[in-house]
């Protein structure tokens, strides 16, 4: 597979990632920060099922720091998702480079405390977490695996934007 074909495969992966992120953000993540009345009972039940089944303490009783990440997702990331979907599914949109770098770094930065919480928090002593919590290493790793794509795909995006010869920044020079 040549460089243009590889680039198109990565662009399609990224386009589908952003496309899939729209309903996940709207119907799951933002329930923690938007009024409950906005969501049909089916979506509320889906979130309850997920949070209980996977013992996700952040979505059962979201702490303030996690809600701040969700607010950023609402204000900054959600408007970017359709733009990024368009740019990557269309392909060859060099203008997406800078916004994609900003998105990827922001998202990876928010995932560090989330994944660290799942891996290292002593939930038996943590009074800020109510409801079911991961108790075993297997339950913690299961939660990490649910959130890991939101660290890995932005990392791929960042490397792609920084290393792809197609997306590399070229300084425009004035002709004399």
UniProtKB/Swiss-Prot annotation:
It comes from the Eukaryota. Residues 10-158 form the EXPERA domain. Induction: Up-regulated in ovarian surface epithelial (OSE) cells with progesterone. This is Sigma intracellular receptor 2. Its main location: endoplasmic reticulum. Changing residue 121 to Q: No effect on DTG binding. Changing residue 171 to Q: Decreases DTG binding. One of its GO terms (cellular component) is rough endoplasmic reticulum membrane. Residues 1-9, 90-99, 162-176 are cytoplasmic. The chain crosses the membrane at residues 10-30, 69-89, 100-120, 141-161. Homodimer. Interacts with NPC1; the interaction impairs NPC1-mediated cholesterol transport. Interacts with PGRMC1 and LDLR; the interaction increases LDL internalization. Interacts with histatin 1/HTN1; the interaction induces HTN1-stimulating wound healing. Interacts with TSPO. Forms a complex with TSPO and PGRMC1; the interaction occurs in MIA PaCa-2 cells but not in MCF7 cells. Keywords: Endoplasmic reticulum, Membrane, Nucleus, Transmembrane, Transmembrane helix. Sigma-2 receptor which contributes to ameliorate dysfunctional cellular processes and slow degenerative progression by regulating cell functions including cholesterol biosynthesis/trafficking, membrane trafficking, autophagy, lipid membrane-bound protein trafficking, and receptor stabilization at the cell surface. Forms a ternary complex with PGRMC1 receptor and low density lipoprotein receptor/LDLR at the plasma membrane, which increases LDLR-mediated LDL cholesterol internalization. Pfam families: EBP. Sigma receptors are classified into two subtypes (Sigma-1 and Sigma-2) based on their different pharmacological profile. Sigma-2 receptor is identified by radioligand-binding studies as a binding site with high affinity for di-o-tolylguanidine (DTG) and haloperidol. Belongs to the TMEM97/sigma-2 receptor family. Changing residue 11 to Q: Decreases DTG binding.
